[in-house]
Amino acid sequence: MSNIRYISNLTRDTYALILAGGRGSRLYELTDWRAKPALYFGGKYRIIDFPLSNCINSGIRRVGVVTQYKSHSLIRHVTRGWGHFKKELGESVEILPASQQTSGNWYQGTADAVFQNIDIIRQEIPKYVMILSGDHIYRMDYAGLLAAHAESGAEMTVCCLETPIDEAAGAFGVMEVDSEHRVIGFEEKPAEPKSIPSDPTMCLASMGNYVFNTKFLFEQLKKDANNEKSDRDFGKDIIPAIIENHKVFAFPFSSAVAGQPSYWRDVGTLDSFFQANMELLLPTPPLNLYDAKWPIWTYQEQLPPAKFVFDDDDRRGMAVDSIVSGGCIISGAKVKRCVLFDEVRVCSYSFVKDSVLLPDVVVLKNCKIQNAILDRGCIIPEGMVIGYNHDHDRAKGFRVSEKGVTLVTRKMLGLPVGYE
């Protein structure tokens, strides 16, 4: 009981700041009209729901969501789905858009995004500030991270993950640690990451999740703000500047959720986004969205149930090994190994397999589609074939990823585009 009370005190003394202002340029047209944290995932969620759910499930009830790039759909989603917390009970999920709080500039980097909200954080009087990336899919109990931070006497703790060197090169900050997990070296997105001693093919990558003692964080942010040569970034500037003279520790993600398999995905490319969605279709997926003990919360629209119609020999409405969300209608068509978001319609004689269809997609009659991502609101014309010949896909103006996934958006189809 005393340990539970100790953890509870830590989470109550913590303010979480989720950095959700990034574009996600490697997702190309998928983020032309939305920030990466607002991108859909898993049939009914958005990426931002995962760090937010981790906070709530971990007992952290004071959260700020920092927004910047094309944030309309993100702000609307968080306001609708996460606006039920009561400030008078010490609970809140607040939107913190780039509003030039401390200067005439927009957020210049991750550290600047926190610095420009320093007065808002100060009003919460937290003992600890947790800074979280808003654009990854993962499950993590932050209470364990806070406990490790407090017990180690750290001034800053960095969440880390063993990652293949070829995946980390140019993509993640890479750390060196001693036998007690104290950080003794840090490089931001090196071309040639240093390997861990036990495995020359792996390195220790930063997940972009940090815990700071509040006073220490404020001191470092003010110091960085006065440095004209700084890029205002935690990975490039703050961490390298403090590891020599301050207590900075690494927290291994493998110990993030007791009794649960580790799950973390960077869905920052078309291929990784597609693969992470496809993994959910496995009989035992690496991410269990059906775990009642660790629910993923989101905004719930009032939609009718999914419907499958027609059972004729030549047109049978059916879906196999698929996720089919509310409001979908499969009308005399076959869907196989697909993730269908809300209100998707697939019309007679069409066959869609191994694909991700975002909300409000309509596939008209006699279409054949495979290995594709169809963006929200796409209307696929009758008889169109997608994913069977990459040269033909490119000739139609579609984008084909390195691993052969075809992306189709409304603009590529000649349909009107704009904010969601």
Swiss-Prot record:
Pathway note: Glycan biosynthesis; glycogen biosynthesis
InterPro entries in the cross-refs: ADP-Glc_PPase, ADP_Glu_pyroP_CS, GlgC_bac, GlmU/GlgC-like_hexapep, NTP_transferase_dom, Nucleotide-diphossugar_trans, Trimer_LpxA-like_sf
CDD domains hit by this protein: ADP_Glucose_PP, LbH_G1P_AT_C
Pfam families assigned: Hexapep_GlmU, NTP_transferase
GO MF annotation list: ATP binding; glucose-1-phosphate adenylyltransferase activity
SUPFAM superfamilies cross-referenced by the UniProt entry: Nucleotide-diphospho-sugar transferases (SSF53448), Trimeric LpxA-like enzymes (SSF51161)
EC number: 2.7.7.27
GO BP term (any one): glycogen biosynthetic process
Keywords: ATP-binding, Carbohydrate metabolism, Glycogen biosynthesis, Glycogen metabolism, Nucleotide-binding, Nucleotidyltransferase, Transferase
Function of the protein: Involved in the biosynthesis of ADP-glucose, a building block required for the elongation reactions to produce glycogen. Catalyzes the reaction between ATP and alpha-D-glucose 1-phosphate (G1P) to produce pyrophosphate and ADP-Glc.
HAMAP family for the chain: GlgC (MF_00624)
Listed name of the protein: Glucose-1-phosphate adenylyltransferase
Native species: Shewanella frigidimarina (strain NCIMB 400)
